[in-house]
Amino acid sequence: MKFIIKLFPEITIKSQSVRLRFIKILTGNIRNVLKHYDETLAVVRHWDNIEVRAKDENQRLVIRDALTRIPGIHHILEVEDVPFTDMHDIFEKALAQYREQLEGKTFCVRVKRRGKHEFSSIEVERYVGGGLNQHIESARVKLTNPDVTVHLEVEDDRLLLIKGRYEGIGGFPIGTQEDVLSLISGGFDSGVSSYMLMRRGCRVHYCFFNLGGAAHEIGVRQVAHYLWNRFGSSHRVRFVAINFEPVVGEILEKVDDGQMGVVLKRMMVRAASKVAERYGVQALVTGEALGQVSSQTLTNLRLIDNVSDTLILRPLISYDKEHIINLARQIGTEDFARTMPEYCGVISKSPTVKAIKAKIEAEEENFDFSILDKVVEEANNVDIREIAQQTQQEVVEVETVSGFGPNDVILDIRSVDEQDDKPLKVEGVDVVSLPFYKLSTKFGDLDQSKTWLLWCERGVMSRLQALYLREQGFANVKVYRP
């Protein structure tokens, strides 16, 4: 079998040296992706296309599918490469190939020709089209919007019978641009923004700020692995996970409510910039869109950017949510994003949309930056190829209950402000308050003869914190969902 890879048009308008470099990189990327399917596969580059030849017919569909997901490819032609002698020979081969496909249909013939011949492309189109029209009684020529377009390519003494055309994702080959670090949360925005930078030729590494324990990290790892495996597997990339719970805890205790969102984002940018510098990455990528949430106003984004010299790319800055969700659906991350948890208690209730630099800096003076340095130093860095095996390990399950027994105590894990605004009172059972960001250090001080029913407004943080405590060896925890 043979495939002809057509280049993304922006590649073809580059200077000769740049075009050759892009084609060389794309050829290498194709080899890296396809070698897992057929070790005998051959990839040959030319000035205006790349040929892929393989012997194992059983791998035809998977090879074709893989090619449609490699950045830099405009479209793929599946072809049968045969020799020919003259125009009549071209017609006979076209008739044998397309007879069944053209019965009862309207059609036209389109020919591309390279090399020296005694005929022109238009002459071949007329001769083959007329012959097909005469020999297939139910077929009819229609030059505009036909049911079937018969594509033929003539190159020297070879005829390429095009059996199918399949669209690629376009863009630039990965590796033609410099590396970036995507701040991935597993939601709609970060997945789409990561894809967009891969499509633009960047090798995308991933940085995840863990706010909710092992279950959340496993979910985000699966999203990152999916994106890499589907669109970027030609290159090795890193997945860096930073336990940000201590940072969130410090913010909730030391920072004014209205400034929390901006301060949290500034801390994330500081941490990600340190990771980027460590690995020689040139830019950060976020999924922020202008005005989508309070921290994404121009004033706040400017303040967030000011904490680092590292370039921050925001490919979705002008996109609306519907457009982003549609893109997530197209690339296959929508289902991941819809099931990814949101966190109660992490963002302030009355966030500022126009933060003042002096006030933000004054709030940050109360922050213990040694905590930020420590979580970055302890960040977990893994090769993304290992994630498939690691995420297969089962997360400890935790029981969810709607009632309570005589030995049960409800543990309200919301932030202090949320508890003050809406105190939890449940008749017939004791309620104890312990904010989620203190669970890792303070839960062991509680009466371990009791069964603790963790509760929060949405039930997401309580489940994740219960999972975390179970992993730490505490078997006396459940989730309370009345």
UniProtKB/Swiss-Prot annotation:
CDD domains referenced in this protein's UniProt entry, alphabetically: PPase_ThiI (cd01712), RHOD (cd00158), THUMP_ThiI (cd11716)
Keywords: ATP-binding, Cytoplasm, Disulfide bond, Nucleotide-binding, Redox-active center, RNA-binding, Thiamine biosynthesis, Transferase, tRNA-binding
Catalyzed reactions: [ThiI sulfur-carrier protein]-S-sulfanyl-L-cysteine + a uridine in tRNA + 2 reduced [2Fe-2S]-[ferredoxin] + ATP + H(+) = [ThiI sulfur-carrier protein]-L-cysteine + a 4-thiouridine in tRNA + 2 oxidized [2Fe-2S]-[ferredoxin] + AMP + diphosphate; [ThiS sulfur-carrier protein]-C-terminal Gly-Gly-AMP + S-sulfanyl-L-cysteinyl-[cysteine desulfurase] + AH2 = [ThiS sulfur-carrier protein]-C-terminal-Gly-aminoethanethioate + L-cysteinyl-[cysteine desulfurase] + A + AMP + 2 H(+)
UniProt-listed Pfam families: ThiI (PF02568), ThiI_fer (PF22025), THUMP (PF02926)
GO BP term (any one): thiamine biosynthetic process
Main location: cytoplasm
Subcellular localization, as worded in the UniProt entry: Cytoplasm
Residues that coordinate or bind ATP: 183-184, 265, 287, 296
PROSITE patterns registered for this protein in UniProt: RHODANESE_3, THUMP
HAMAP family, A to Z: ThiI
Known function: Catalyzes the ATP-dependent transfer of a sulfur to tRNA to produce 4-thiouridine in position 8 of tRNAs, which functions as a near-UV photosensor. Also catalyzes the transfer of sulfur to the sulfur carrier protein ThiS, forming ThiS-thiocarboxylate. This is a step in the synthesis of thiazole, in the thiamine biosynthesis pathway. The sulfur is donated as persulfide by IscS.
Protein name: tRNA sulfurtransferase
Phylogenetic placement of the source organism: Bacteria, Pseudomonadati, Pseudomonadota, Gammaproteobacteria, Enterobacterales
